[in-house]
Amino acid sequence: MLAKDFLFMKNIRITIEYDGTGYAGWQRQAGSFCTVQGEIERILSQILQEDIRLAGAGRTDKGVHARAQIATFKSRSSLGPDRMVHSMNALLPNTIRISDPLVVPEGFHARHSAKEREYRYFVREEPSAVLGRFSGCSYGSLDLMSMNRVASYVLGEHDFSVFSKETRDRTGCLCRVISCKWFRQREFFVLRISANRFLRSMVRYLAALMIDSGKGLLSPEEAREMIESGILTRQLVPAAPNGLFLWKITYGSDSHSF
């Protein structure tokens, strides 16, 4: 038995920022797909000489970015957290950065302990060769008031299954949206939305619904009916992934708040 097998098993939490453009999403996948989780696990396993498996707070889709993804993993390594992160950043591609390493209580879990997740969606009215990597485009003017009227209807608990790629039965599709609002930030229209949980691609579908209302393609009342009835009255294409960021994860005081 190796000496390190006798070392105390630590639960380590890290914050991850990434440009999701070149990745097939966050979650590890079988085959040759390059994912953010897969890249970090590969480098961590190499550094710590252990088989490392991450648990992430959010499972972002292909092309979606993160400002502050949270992940936890277990390790027996004696390597200090700060030195570990320094080594990770030296070996990871420059599209992934790790920060704020912290040893947390055994019961803390990046996903299960999360109380609230915040996403932001950035969209411009005109395409940009430079900014397009990190923003969607409406290809036309947007009415902020109409978008925020629809945003107000999103608040509260709803079955969002029609606004997702979720394959589970409808009983698992209830989400409680805590905040939802659009604001202007220079040339961007920015959606800030937070909830206790999100379904797969849910933010992108809701962003598309609100953007369509802002373009005058559907009325806020029609959008409200779709949200409340759970029935789409027209085809809805999810907003482009490049405009979406996992922005913040909030934890309760009973499980550490970061």
Curated annotation (Swiss-Prot):
Catalytic positions are 61 (nucleophile)
Residues that bind substrate: 119
Q: Which UniProt keywords apply?
A: Isomerase, tRNA processing
Annotated catalysed reactions: uridine(38/39/40) in tRNA = pseudouridine(38/39/40) in tRNA
Question: Which Gene3D superfamilies does the annotation name?
Answer: Pseudouridine synthase I, catalytic domain, C-terminal subdomain, Pseudouridine synthase I, catalytic domain, N-terminal subdomain
Tell me, what's a Pfam family for it?
PseudoU_synth_1
InterPro entries, alphabetically? Answer: PsdUridine_synth_cat_dom_sf, PsdUridine_synth_TruA, PsdUridine_synth_TruA_a/b_dom, PsdUridine_synth_TruA_C, TruA/RsuA/RluB/E/F_N
Provide the GO biological process annotations.
Answer: tRNA pseudouridine synthesis
Gene Ontology molecular function: RNA binding; tRNA pseudouridine(38-40) synthase activity
Under which EC number(s) is this enzyme classified?
A: 5.4.99.12
Which function does this protein serve? Formation of pseudouridine at positions 38, 39 and 40 in the anticodon stem and loop of transfer RNAs.
Family in the record: Belongs to the tRNA pseudouridine synthase TruA family.
What binding partners and quaternary form does the record give?
Homodimer.
Tell me the HAMAP family matching this sequence: TruA
Q: Which NCBIfam families does the UniProt entry name for this protein?
A: hisT_truA
**Name of the protein in question:** tRNA pseudouridine synthase A
Name its species.
Answer: Chlorobium phaeobacteroides (strain DSM 266 / SMG 266 / 2430)
